[in-house]
Structures are given as structure tokens and as C-alpha cells.
């Protein structure tokens, strides 16, 4: 903005990730770069990222498994840059000091969440890859779709966690995979998403089982809208930027679908507006 508060220059962008800035480098330049954040300070001292690494590839896709298997992880980046492939098996975000994948297959013997990531070890101008997620559930079968939600433990618990601070509107990063209710629960989609608590203080927030809102196209933490028919009784709706994972409020432990069922029955055959729903196991 100039001295009269008129826009002097603007740029519409989509952030590549939450911990990366986009700005002019050097200051007042016409060149726009990915930068290390320098809030309130000059961009002249920021590290400039010229490229990003490709994410690792897992040999077995997320889903339901019935027996133990060996998991292999592939680094798809060419040999022009020195990299390190790391992983975790507890759902936490990999760091450069996490376990290094050396090429030896990882034995998966029970339900496991793996996150893998690739870092440049020498060239600081390369952004680390996005995380690759694999969630393997052993001998699971549901009559409902299954929604797999992975996030850092301290995003939920502790002084900065949204479970332990359920009255906050804090937004956290997560990854979601949707498995359909068809035989074998095939994957419908997976994506990065933002998550936050939702609902009223009298039920949806305060009870041990909480309600979430997922924002698939969140500008910093999400990825894109979901172009799928997620709720069967409104097949004309095939684009979702948000969904509400509702715990059933005061009926959360006895009849969590009560409100949704009553509303659906009262709206059947009428032109009344109502909230459609699809039961899901999370």
C-alpha cells in the first residue's frame, strides 16, 4: 500500500506449505521467490529456495491388510542432489534426525502409521519433500467408510493441543485418507487438510469424543477441494471444501446419529433444507 492506503502492488498466490514464505527477493525486486520466513524483517537475509524435492514412494499403499509384509521406500529424486530419506512409525513428522531408510525393507507386523520424507543434506536451496503417509490396518472390517486422520500428537494434546484446549479455534495440520465401505475398503482419496475443533461448548467440544472440521482447501495447510460424492443421499453434491465430523453432541455415547436421523426423516419427501450425513468410522 502507498501513503494513501491504495494498493501499490499485489500478487495472488497459493502457499506451497505453512513454513515457507513467498516474497520479493531482494527487497523491492520484481522477482518473486520461495523464502525462509523473516517476519517483520528484510527479505535480503532470507534463504531462497529454488526447487523442492519429490516425496518418497511406498511399495504398499494405505489400506486394510490381512498379513505381515515388508515395506520398501523409494527415493524418486535424481542423483544431482545429495538427499537423506527418513521415516517415523508413530505418526509424528519426520525430521532430518529421524530414522534413516537404508534400503532394508521395514517389517510391518501390526497396525502402523508410517510417515516418510526426503531432505537435501548439502544444498540448502532445496525444500524438503512433502511427507508421504502409509496407514496399514490389520484385519479391520466396517460397515461404514473409514476415515484415517494423521497428525502430530502435540497438535491434539498438551499446551498447544486442540483436544486439551477444546474451546479454542486453533487450526492444525493433518493428513486424511478416505476408505470406502465397499469390500476391502478401497481408497477414495487422500490429501493434506487443516483440522480444528467445532461445535458448541455443551456437547460437541466438551465431551471426551470431540467434533472436528476438516478444511481440505485451507490456504496454508490444505491441498484442494475433494471432487467426490461423499454423501449418498445428495449425489448431486460432488465438491467439498470442508466436512464436519460430528460426535453426536449430548448423545455422543448412546445414539450419536440421533439428530441426523430425525432431521433426515422429517425432510423425506419435502423441500425442507436439512443437513445430510454419512456415518463414518474415524
Annotate each PLM feature:
Residues 7-10, 82, 240, 257:
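A broad structural signal for short, well-ordered beta-strand segments within beta-sheet-rich domains
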Residues 12, 62, 202-204:
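Short Gly/Pro-enriched turn/cap motifs at secondary-structure boundaries
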Residues 1-5:
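Secretome/extracellular-domain signature
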Residues 149, 160, 165-282:
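Conserved ATP-binding subdomain of kinase catalytic cores across diverse folds
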Residues 8-11, 277-279:
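Short beta-alpha junctions and helix-cap segments that line functional grooves
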Residues 6, 14-194, 218:
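Short, compositionally stereotyped local motifs that mark structural "simplifiers"
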Amino acid at each position: 500500500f502507498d501513503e494513501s492506503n491504495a494498493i501499490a502492488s499485489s500478487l495472488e498466490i497459493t502457499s506451497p506449505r505453512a513454513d515457507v514464505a513467498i516474497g520479493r527477493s531482494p527487497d523491492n525486486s520484481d522477482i518473486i521467490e520461495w523464502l525462509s520466513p523473516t517476519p517483520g524483517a528484510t527479505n535480503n537475509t532470507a534463504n531462497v529456495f529454488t526447487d523442492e524435492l519429490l516425496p518418497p514412494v511406498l511399495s504398499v499403499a494405505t489400506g486394510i491388510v490381512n498379513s505381515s509384509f515388508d515395506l520398501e521406500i523409494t527415493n524418486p529424486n535424481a542423483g544431482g542432489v545429495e538427499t537423506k530419506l527418513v521415516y517415523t512409525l508413530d505418526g509424528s513428522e519426520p525430521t532430518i534426525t529421524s530414522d534413516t531408510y537404508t534400503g532394508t525393507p521395514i517389517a510391518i507386523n501390526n497396525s502402523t502409521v508410517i510417515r516418510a520424507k526426503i531432505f537435501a543434506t548439502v544444498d540448502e536451496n532445496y525444500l524438503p519433500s512433502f511427507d508421504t503417509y502409509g496407514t496399514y490396518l490389520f484385519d479391520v472390517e466396517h460397515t461404514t467408510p473409514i476415515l484415517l486422520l494423521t497428525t502430530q500428537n502435540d497438535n491434539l494434546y498438551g499446551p498447544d493441543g486442540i483436544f486439551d484446549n477444546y474451546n479454542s479455534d486453533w487450526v492444525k495440520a493433518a493428513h486424511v485418507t478416505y476408505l470406502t465401505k465397499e469390500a476391502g475398503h478401497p481408497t477414495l482419496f487422500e490429501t493434506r487438510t487443516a483440522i480444528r475443533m467445532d461445535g458448541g461448548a455443551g456437547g460437541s467440544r466438551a465431551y471426551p469424543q470431540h467434533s472436528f472440521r476438516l478444511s481440505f482447501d485451507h490456504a496454508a495447510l490444505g491441498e484442494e477441494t475433494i471432487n467426490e460424492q461423499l454423501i449418498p443421499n445428495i449425489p448431486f453434491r460432488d465438491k467439498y471444501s470442508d466436512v464436519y465430523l460430528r460426535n453426536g453432541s449430548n448423545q455422543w455415547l448412546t445414539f450419536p446419529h440421533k439428530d441426523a436421523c430425525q432431521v433426515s426423516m422429517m425432510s423425506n419427501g419435502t423441500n425442507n433444507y436439512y443437513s445430510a450425513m454419512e456415518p463414518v468410522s474415524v
